[in-house]
Structures are given as structure tokens and as C-alpha cells.
Design a protein with these regions (language model features):
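Bacterial Sec-dependent N-terminal signal peptides
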Residues: 1-22
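Post-cleavage N-terminal segment of exported redox proteins
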Residues: 16-21, 218-296, 383, 387, ...
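Hydrophobic, well-ordered secondary-structure elements that form the walls
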Residues: 20, 520, 533, 577-580
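Mature extracytoplasmic or organellar-lumen-exposed domains after removal of signal/transit peptides
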Residues: 20-278
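Sec-exported extracytoplasmic/periplasmic mature domains
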Residues: 42, 46-49, 62-76, 115, ...
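Extracytoplasmic redox metalloprotein regions
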Residues: 87-148, 152-156, 302, 306-310, ...
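Short glycine/threonine-rich turn/loop motifs
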Residues: 266-374, 437-535, 540-543, 549-556
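Extracellular low-complexity, Gly/Ser/Thr-rich intrinsically disordered linkers
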Residues: 537-548, 556-586
Length: 590
């Protein structure tokens, strides 16, 4: 009996020592699922070669794309470049390093061949795209073989996948034509479920079971409510996605799995996308010494309102950025410094602009500090000089004291001026609107506001460019890139606006008439709209998008990135959309 007990103990100890780490089990599941995607794409290729019916092709495409959703959690996390080649937008990409324009590839390109119908004459081109996709999937398989996971990264990836489902999945971002993103989101949830069960390890613990029940509820809701336009995204996010990401966060804490120590736009410790402090403005700045402090904010506010920064002491930043108008001026275009002509573009809001990777409508600078300098030295705007401002400020005892508090290690200098201004602008991102409160479970929406949110993230396709929750063009869930779009904005004479936008910077044809996607936080206060201020009301803006942008107006732009198909919004839906957009107003403006 004694010997038997000793033998049992030895067996248990041996088993524990040789147990496969959970993150390795996750990796094995991931690598196995990659092979399934490769197989499904191979079947699609075979059906194309056999000249199979459109219905069968579409069905197999959806099966293949859904199988990719089973690997997306880990693929997007560890291999973003390969993942983009597999499932990125069907838009050409400009490489800033070498000035080359790369054609799109992957599932979304193939989707355009097969949906809404398939033309057999494009068979050769379609097979070519299938071949490219297959090669990229094999590349994913190859790089995954030597990749090592950790428990911390697995949990980080699972939460990010929930955020990806919210922002890119149920909004239709990666199924723009077939509009099958709702059932495909269920496939993405299934991958989270598989990985989570490995950590739950058949545990009957109530907290583990609660997460699994939430996933089950989510899958059932996604599979039974597949109509893209009718899907209640507000309910799904508040009742399923948010509780799920919170549950994953709590499990990570309970298992004592460390959170990733990394400075990111979306904090690695965020429980949901909509936490009050989910985003880190410092992650969007250049260096640690750019860090925002209360002293810098106070100094920056003084400088912002002081004409000392302009060449003739006649205007300040606040001259064109009025705090009561969410830091716009209500004009189509501001008056130039000469008092006669107009500046080139409409004055944008400064609220909530900190969470972007580029600034100005043409994306010409990367940091708020550089934006401040560009405005100060622009001869039409302030025509100032930081060097001269330093001299002037050193003569003011009050400024000397303020700078000493904000920058105790240095005297007044050019860096201090621009960093203080940028720090003040960063402080203008409050994220305390009714929308934020609604997503945090602290506010209630009326029926029109809920309908408007569901339109914004669904039928109206607003959220495929104005990504929630920031509502700008900074792409979630990594928030590493801010996008520009070609909309075909008209001038006041109903012709294509002559402003070439980002093209002036890159000289790339895909950027002709391209402009950065701005935030629409406080949008009810920031009229007139667009880079040229051509639209006076939100109703006019919605009509423009509803008609298909510039091409809907007959401009025939070859590089328009906005879908030119009409949205067919009803008058009621337009009103509901505006009702939602008004919930994006900061609390101080209520």
C-alpha cells in the first residue's frame, strides 16, 4: 500500500513536470487552425477552376474567410504585416519609405470579385489573387512555427480581439460588400473561447464559467441576428463585448498573469475600450520629456491665449480656436493675418485631437508640438518666430516663473513653448460625453440615440472611417496609424474642390484630394464642415455621404476611397444619426 502511494505521487509529479504550458497549447491550436484556412482557400481555388456556380463560390468564400477569423486573434497580434496582406482593406497602400504604391491583396480583394456577383471573364485575375492569398497564408504558417507565445501575450491578444470585433468586425470594415461580418464575428469569438478554455481547464469556478457563458451568449446573439442593418450593436457592446473584456481582464488578474508593460495608445491594462482612462496621450507623443504635466498645461493655456507668439502681437491661437465652439471659429475659413484673404482650410477642432498619429488635413506632421510650430511660423496665420518669442517671454517675470515650474531643468526655450502648447491641447481630450457615459453604463440613450448609434456603426458605415470610440481615423485596436480618405468633397460651386490635400506632400496619385479623417467629437459645435467648410449643417454632410460622395455627384474620381453606392438612408434615419452624433459633445458644453 505504501509503495503504491509513493508510485502515485511520483506519477503525479512527473506529469506536472511534463505538462505542456497553456500558452504552448494555444500556439498548437493556432498553428493547426492556420492549416484549416489554407485548406479552405484551396477548396475555393478548386471550385473556381471547375467553373462552379456563383452560389457555391460565395458560400466557400465565406467559409474560408470565417476560418481565418479563427486565427485572427493570434495572427493580428504577432504578425500584423502578414495579417494585413491576408485580410487588409482592398485599397492601394503608399509606402512612405520608398515612395512606392502597393496594390491591395487578400480576402477583401477577392470578395470584390465574388460579391455581389461573379463575372467568369475575371477568372484568371481571380485565380491570381487566390494564389497571392495562398502564398501569404503559407507565409503565416511558416513564421508561426518558430514563434513563441506567453500567457501575458495570449490574454492581451484575446482582449484586443474583443476590441477588434467591436471596432472592425460588427461595423463591416472587413466585409464591406458581402456584409457577413456579424456571423464572422461569431467565429472570432469561437477562437477566444478555445483559448480561454485552455486556461479555464474544466474549472467549475464561477468567474471562469461567467466568461464562458458570456462568450456563448455572444455567439448565439451573432448567429441569430445576422441582418447587418438591423443588428443592435449598442446591445452587443454593452451587454456582451464589454462584460467579456472585463471578464478576461479579471481572469488574468486572478491567475496572476502579468499585464504587458508597454506604452501603447490603448493602455494594456484597459478593461474595455470605453474605460474613462483607456487611452494614453503620452503614447502619441515623441519622447518621454514631452510628458504632459499640470504645470505645462497651465503654461500652455497662457501661451495659447497670448498674442506674443504672433509676429505683430495681433492674434493668438485662441483667435481662431474659440473654446465655446470646441476650439473652432464657426467660419468657412479664417481671415489671414493680412485681414483680407482667407487661410487655405477650415479651422479644425482641437478637442480630442491628441489621439492621432498625424496632424493637419494633409497629415504633414507627426506630433502636436510640430503642429503648433507650423501654425506659429505660417505667414498667413501667425507669422511668428519661436526664437523671437523666447526673447520676449524672458522679459516677462510671470512667464519666467511659469516656465521654471513647468521646466525646472531648463530656461525658457523653443522646446518649452511648443511642448507647453501641445500639453494644453492634449488636456482638451476629456471623453466625458453622454456617449462615453452610455458605454460605461452610467448614462441612458433614448430610442433615437440608440438607433443613431446602430446606424453610425452599421448601415451608414460612418464607423468604418470614424472608428469608435475616438471617432477619428486612427485605426483600432493598435491605434498606430491615422488614415486619410478621398471623399470627393465639392467646392461651393458644386465642383470638385481644387485642394489636392495629401497629394501635395507625397505626390502619390492615390493621395490626390485625400484628407485625414478627423474626430467628430463635439461635431454639433464645429460647423461648418469638411476641410474647406463647404457644408453648413450636419444634414448637408449626411446627404453628401448618402449620395456616395464626389462620385455620387458625378465627379468620376478613380481614387475615391468612399464607397460610391448610395446609403439609402430615410429622413428618420438621418435625424437619428444626428441625434447620436450630438451625444459626442463634451459634458462642459451641455
Amino acid at each position: 500500500m505504501k509503495n503504491s502511494f509513493i508510485l502515485l505521487v511520483l506519477i503525479v509529479l512527473f506529469s506536472c513536470q511534463n505538462a505542456i504550458p497553456k500558452h504552448e497549447t494555444v500556439n498548437n491550436v493556432f498553428k493547426s487552425d492556420i492549416l484549416k484556412v489554407i485548406d479552405e482557400v484551396s477548396k475555393l481555388e478548386h471550385l473556381i477552376k471547375l467553373n462552379t456556380s456563383i452560389g457555391q463560390l460565395q458560400q466557400q468564400f465565406l467559409k474560408a474567410h470565417s476560418s481565418y477569423k479563427q486565427v485572427e486573434t493570434i495572427s493580428e497580434y504577432y504578425f500584423p504585416a502578414v495579417s494585413k496582406a491576408i485580410n487588409g482593406p482592398a485599397l492601394a497602400e503608399f509606402e512612405e519609405n520608398d515612395g512606392k504604391t502597393l496594390p491591395p491583396e487578400g480576402f477583401q480583394v477577392i470578395e470584390e470579385f465574388i460579391f455581389p456577383t461573379y463575372n467568369p471573364k475575371s477568372k484568371a485575375e481571380l485565380l491570381k489573387e487566390i494564389g497571392i492569398l495562398s502564398a501569404n497564408l503559407k507565409r503565416l504558417d511558416k513564421v508561426s512555427q518558430t514563434n513563441e507565445l506567453t500567457d501575458s501575450h495570449v490574454f492581451d491578444a484575446m482582449r484586443l480581439e474583443v476590441f477588434r470585433i467591436i471596432t472592425l468586425g460588427i461595423t463591416g470594415f472587413d466585409s464591406p460588400i458581402a456584409q457577413k461580418s456579424i456571423p464572422e464575428a461569431a467565429s472570432a469569438l469561437e477562437s477566444i473561447e478555445k483559448y480561454y478554455k485552455i486556461y479555464a481547464d474544466n474549472s467549475t469556478d464561477e468567474s471562469f464559467q461567467k466568461v464562458l457563458k458570456t462568450i456563448k451568449k455572444g455567439k448565439e446573439y451573432l448567429k441569430t441576428n445576422t441582418n447587418f442593418n438591423a443588428f443592435d450593436r449598442a446591445f452587443f457592446i454593452r451587454e456582451i463585448a464589454n462584460p467579456l473584456s472585463i471578464g478576461l481582464h479579471k481572469t488574468q488578474v486572478s491567475l496572476k498573469i502579468p499585464f504587458i508593460k508597454e506604452t501603447r495608445g490603448l493602455k494594456t491594462t484597459a478593461q474595455t475600450l470605453f474605460d474613462k482612462n483607456a487611452f494614453d496621450a503620452e503614447a502619441f507623443s515623441a519622447f518621454p520629456d514631452y510628458e504632459t504635466t499640470p504645470e505645462k498645461i497651465e503654461l500652455g493655456k497662457l501661451l495659447f491665449n497670448d498674442p506674443v507668439l504672433s509676429g505683430d502681437n495681433s492674434r493668438s491661437c485662441a483667435s481662431c480656436h474659440h473654446s465655446d465652439k470646441a476650439f473652432t471659429d464657426g467660419l468657412e475659413k479664417s481671415i489671414s493675418l493680412d485681414g483680407k484673404s482667407l487661410v487655405k482650410r477650415n479651422t479644425p477642432t482641437l478637442t480630442h485631437i491628441a489621439f492621432q498619429r498625424v496632424f493637419f488635413s494633409d497629415s504633414r506632421v507627426n506630433y502636436l508640438e510640430d503642429q503648433a510650430v507650423a501654425v506659429i511660423i505660417n505667414e498667413n496665420e501667425m507669422h511668428g518666430s519661436l526664437a523671437k518669442s523666447v526673447v520676449a517671454l524672458k522679459k516677462e517675470a510671470s512667464y519666467v516663473a511659469k516656465f521654471q515650474k513647468a521646466f525646472p531643468k531648463t530656461a525658457i526655450d523653443e522646446f518649452g513653448i511648443k511642448n507647453a502648447l501641445a500639453s494644453y491641447i492634449r488636456s482638451l481630450s476629456t471623453y466625458d460625453s453622454k456617449f462615453d457615459g452610455f458605454m460605461q453604463g452610467e448614462e441612458k440613450f433614448d430610442l433615437d440615440e440608440i438607433a443613431g448609434f446602430n446606424l453610425f456603426t452599421g448601415k451608414a458605415k460612418c464607423a468604418t472611417c470614424h472608428f469608435i470610440p475616438l471617432t477619428n481615423g486612427t485605426v483600432p485596436p493598435s491605434f498606430m496609424k491615422s488614415e486619410s480618405e478621398v471623399l470627393g468633397v465639392p467646392d461651393k460651386y458644386k465642383k470638385l474642390d481644387a485642394d489636392l490635400g495629401k497629394f501635395e506632400l507625397t505626390k502619390a496619385e492615390i493621395h490626390r484630394n485625400s484628407f485625414k479623417t478627423p474626430t467628430i467629437r463635439n461635431v454639433e459645435l464645429t460647423a461648418p464642415y469638411m476641410h474647406n467648410g463647404v457644408f453648413k449643417t450636419l444634414e448637408e454632410v449626411i446627404d453628401f455621404y448618402n449620395d456616395g460622395g464626389g462620385n455620387g455627384l458625378g465627379f468620376n474620381l478613380q481614387n475615391q476611397t468612399l464607397p460610391e453606392d448610395k446609403l439609402n438612408l430615410t429622413d428618420l434615419e438621418k435625424k437619428q444619426l444626428i441625434a447620436f452624433m450630438k451625444t459626442l459633445t463634451d459634458k462642459k458644453y451641455y
